[in-house]
Amino acid sequence: AGTDEKPIVTNSKKVPINHFFMDGVYVREMTMFKDTVVIGAIHKHLHMCFLLKGHLAVASEAGVNEYKAPCYIIAEPGEKRVLYAYEESVWYNTHKNEDNIKDIDQLEKNIVAVNYEDYEQYIKNK
């Protein structure tokens, strides 16, 4: 998981992260090894997630769902999710990136909220 100041998971040996950029699109690849748990950040925008390898359980306020690759989900804004890997899994988040920003810290500020209060403030100012 991230920290209070930086809620998004960062690259590590336990959870390798890769970043890909295309015109107007940012894709974040996260590898989760067997029995890894990741607490996701609160995303500000509707986006699509793809599971291209593995088997995950994804818990949110809506409940717990299991996903086996290959599949995708539409991720609603304002949701916080917890992911559990039953086996090594590769998960992709796709985000709009209209300004083609490649600075990861700046992208994260645009994509995720630090906490629910930050998310509510974002919604009010939208």
Question: Where are the predicted features?
Answer:
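Conserved short histidine dyad/triad with adjacent acidic residue
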Residues: 25-44
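Double-stranded beta-helix
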Residues: 86-126
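Glycine- and acidic-residue-biased ligand/ion/polar-headgroup-sensing regions
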Residues: 43-62
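Structural motif
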Residues: 48, 55, 80, 88-90
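Short acidic-glycine-tyrosine-enriched beta hairpin
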Residues: 60-82
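A short, N-terminal "cap"/entry segment at the start of jelly-roll beta-barrel domains
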Residues: 1-29, 61, 119-126
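Surface-exposed loop/turn positions
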Residues: 36, 71, 79, 87-89
